[in-house]
Every structure is written in C-alpha cells, then in structure tokens.
C-alpha cells in the first residue's frame, strides 16, 4: 500500500497470480527460475472446509508477468500453471491467525508460507531474480537496511484500488531464522491485500537480490496494511526449493549489468540508506555489477550442499 506506480523498467521478477480466466490477480509472486514462480503458500491452497487444506489444482491458477496493470495484460503475458507444490510443513492455522502458538515479536514464526508454481513456457519480458544463500545474506543484509516490496495488490486502502504494479520502501527490522519483519518508512507504506507472495528486494554492496516473499501484516500494529510486514525468508527455504524443483530450479546468482531503479524519478525516499545500490547510485539496482569474488560460484556451489543444509535448517 502506498508507494509509487512502477514503470516498465521496474517490473523485474514480479508476477501476478490469478484464478484461471480472471481479469485480475488475487496474489503476487516472484520469478526465481525461468519456469518457476515462488509465492505464498496461502495463495496456492484451498480450504473446502475448516481445517482441511490442500494445494490448489494446477488448472485453477495462472500467472501473468511483464505488465503494469491487469487491464493491459493480454494473453501473451499469461501462463497456465502446470504444477503446484506447497511446503509440506505449511501451517495454515498460523497464517490465518487461528493459532499463533510460539509466535515472536510482530507475529514472526516458522509457518513455511511458501509454494512453487511451475509453468511450461518462459516469459518474454520478466527477469529471474537473483537469490542469496544464508551465508551471503548474513554478510550483506542487516537490521536497518532499506528494502523494496512490489506487488499488484491494494495500493489505496480507502478506495480499495488494486491491479496495478506498485512499489513501496520498507526498513528491515528483525531477521529471524525462517521469516523477517519490516517496519514502515514515513509516510505509511508496505504490503497490503493482494501483495501476498510478492517480492521483497534488497540492495546490497554486491547487487540487488530477492530477500523474501510477502506473507502477512505484523501483529503488533493497528493497521492491516502499510505498517510493516512479515516476509518468508527465501534463504532459509532454498534447500526445500532445490529438493522440490530438482533440475527445474536454475537459480540466478549474478545480479547482472543492467541497473533497474525501483525509485520514482530516481529520487531517494530514504535519506541515509546503508550501503547497496541506494548508497551507490541513488537507486535500487535490480541488476547491478557485483563487487568482490564470484557470487555465482557462491550460490551455485552452495546448492550442492542444500540437501544437507535442509536437515539442519528444519531443526531450527
């Protein structure tokens, strides 16, 4: 909610998740491999009766990418979902607020609110978001850093307007083992209804990465939208993604060379951001030249050990 309308150059890896045949979406997502979208688990399940939850049928979902508005999304930017995989330890009761046992500050927990949507034909006009391993995240991301949330959800709560790609800035507040919290900047802005599953991008000293996925609003604020959020931490779920998707998961580690500013008119809404592309160039470079040695080797090499890491991470 809040924030600013995106431009074509700012679409990056953000996608819209729709019910099949619908003219607009109900959730958002992020492209993490040419044929693979990550989104929130609660966007990819159905609950036919209370307490009975299962993955949505593949034929019931579509994804759209490369567009700024639902009204301008023609058939060329829409793909049918061929397979839906929901995390086997997804806690729907926790996400729906019916049971928050063990929740920490702001409602942070370990509900595994993540699902994968598979497509069979790649998009022509959407980028694959680079990801961070746990070790590189620890090195590059910290409390107080600036991040950007993008999605097709509600951007005007009073009027309930949605269906356009909006971007808002947020401050990383708490980084947990499976989720992270953001706090809003001034003025009000963060995720809202329909942004669920959408990306949280973070600028770092080595480029800009997909850090998390929108899960829900914080539990310690008064507003439903725009006042901080809870995000599924991608680095903690990389072992599950690699195990579930197999060779269909072709992660991108290099941010690349083409810079994409997420800021309106190049302006910097945060006067004193810490490091990253905001500090370097006054813009959030979704694809910027890396510094230091070999981010690609770091990520792709780590994938070889993800099956071993998954056992350790699952015990946290």
Model-found features: residue ranges?
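Short, small/polar residue-rich loop motifs at catalytic or cofactor-binding pockets
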Residues: 23-26, 193-196
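N-terminal activation segment of mature serine protease catalytic domains
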Residues: 1-22
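Solvent-exposed loop/turn segments at secondary-structure junctions
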Residues: 21-23, 37, 43-45, 70, ...
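Chymotrypsin/trypsin-fold serine protease catalytic domain
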Residues: 68-73, 78-81, 110-190, 227-228, ...
